[in-house]
Every structure is written in structure tokens, then in C-alpha cells.
Design a protein with these regions (language model features):
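Long, contiguous binding/interaction regions
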Residues: 1-79, 87-113
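Basic nucleic-acid-binding interfaces
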Residues: 84
Length: 113
């Protein structure tokens, strides 16, 4: 898949938490969020931890474990919200899943290039 750039925002990073506390983002700074998301995209570790929490881990589709060692994430505070730029070759479905694990449904996708 071709590399794409995703432009995302989170209104209040201090409230950006996923459904599973043990997998959620725990920081408050844009830099720490960028590092957490970048790690989640570059390796399958977060996905593997999520899979282990499922009632039937063997039934989970392993295609979602794909990672992109070259993924980059930049984040910066802009007024009262955080602007995030993700560059990756991963499909949107994988990015969305990992974002939801880290930040719940607090993020908004604004553009893809």
C-alpha cells in the first residue's frame, strides 16, 4: 500500500483514553502521545496485547497485526487541542483500531493525502 498522510485532532489529550485501561494512552503531552502512537504503528505489540485480552484470541484475524516500521507521528498543541500528523503505509482500518485502543473515540480525522 502507498504511504498516506493522515491529519487528526484530539480536543482534550488528558481525556484521550481507550476502552482497555491497560492499553490506553496515559500521558498528557502531544510528544508522549506521538511516541505512543508511533510505537503502536511500528510494531504489533499493542495489537498483540489487545488480542490476548479477547475471549477467543485464536478467532481474531491476524491481518490486523500488520505494522509499518517506517511510520512517523508528529503531534503539537494548537490552542486547546492537539493536532496530529501520521505518515504510514498501513490501511486506515489498522490506524483507526490502534488509535481507538490508545485514545478511545476522542480523535477526529480531518484529511488524508
Amino acid at each position: 500500500m502507498a504511504t498516506q498522510r493522515y491529519y487528526i485532532s484530539i480536543d482534550d489529550l488528558s481525556k484521550a483514553r481507550g476502552e482497555y485501561a491497560q492499553l490506553s494512552f496515559e500521558g498528557i503531552s502531544p510528544d508522549s502521545f506521538a511516541a505512543a502512537l508511533q510505537s503502536a504503528l511500528r510494531t504489533p505489540a499493542l495489537w498483540e496485547r489487545w488480542k490476548a485480552l479477547q475471549p477467543d484470541p485464536d478467532a481474531i484475524d491476524d491481518s490486523m497485526s500488520t505494522s509499518d516500521a517506517g511510520a512517523t507521528v508528529k503531534a503539537e498543541q494548537s490552542d486547546l487541542h492537539t493536532e496530529i500528523e501520521v505518515t504510514t503505509s498501513l490501511p486506515h482500518s489498522i490506524l483507526k483500531h490502534r488509535l481507538n485502543l490508545l485514545a478511545g473515540r476522542t480523535w477526529k480525522l480531518h484529511d488524508v493525502k
